[in-house]
């Protein structure tokens, strides 16, 4: 992330699952959209108390409006830079993304993403969780119906595809 970048959208309680054959489970994290990057942060320095409050606010926000281009108080560009120091978090330049789309499922709205990172082709789906079961493993039990269109369009409008 560059120092002049600004956060354009910040989504929490995002469940990411691989679309590869035989993949099991997923990861919870944040999708953060900046001027030039899409990041998936699942190792954050943010406090648990903040996370719990902001996920509840996000659910209320999505009940009122389905728009995914939202930003949450309490997390800024400097915190994103700090989180991206952890190499487990993923930062994509828009041109790394070979395919981006969204789909409405019966159970919720899904963002589908294909990209190449470190010479490896990856394919994931992302959905925003509303409720969770915590035992025996943390997993979503209910997903939100949201409008991924402005989020996807923001990325598509800024890509310079050279392939």
Report residues per predicted region.
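Broad, structure-driven detector of short, well-ordered beta-strand segments within folded domains
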Residues: 29-33
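Acidic, Ser/Thr- and proline-rich intrinsically disordered linker/docking segments
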Residues: 2-4, 26-28, 39-163
């Amino acid at each position: 992330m560059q120092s002049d970048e600004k956060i354009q959208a910040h989504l929490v309680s995002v469940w990411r699952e691989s679309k590869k054959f035989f993949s099991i489970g997923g990861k919870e994290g944040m999708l953060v959209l900046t001027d030039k990057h899409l990041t998936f942060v699942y190792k954050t320095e943010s406090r648990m108390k903040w996370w719990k409050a902001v996920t509840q606010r996000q659910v209320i926000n999505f009940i009122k409006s389905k728009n995914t281009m939202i930003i949450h108080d309490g997390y800024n560009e400097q915190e994103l830079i700090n989180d991206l120091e952890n190499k487990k978090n993923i930062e994509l330049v828009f041109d790394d993304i070979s395919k981006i789309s969204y789909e409405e499922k019966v159970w919720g709205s899904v963002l589908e993403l294909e990209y190449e990172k470190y010479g490896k082709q990856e394919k994931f789906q992302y959905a925003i969780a509303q409720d969770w079961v915590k035992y025996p493993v943390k997993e979503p039990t209910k997903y939100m119906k949201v409008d991924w269109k402005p989020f996807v369009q923001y990325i598509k409008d800024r890509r310079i595809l050279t392939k």
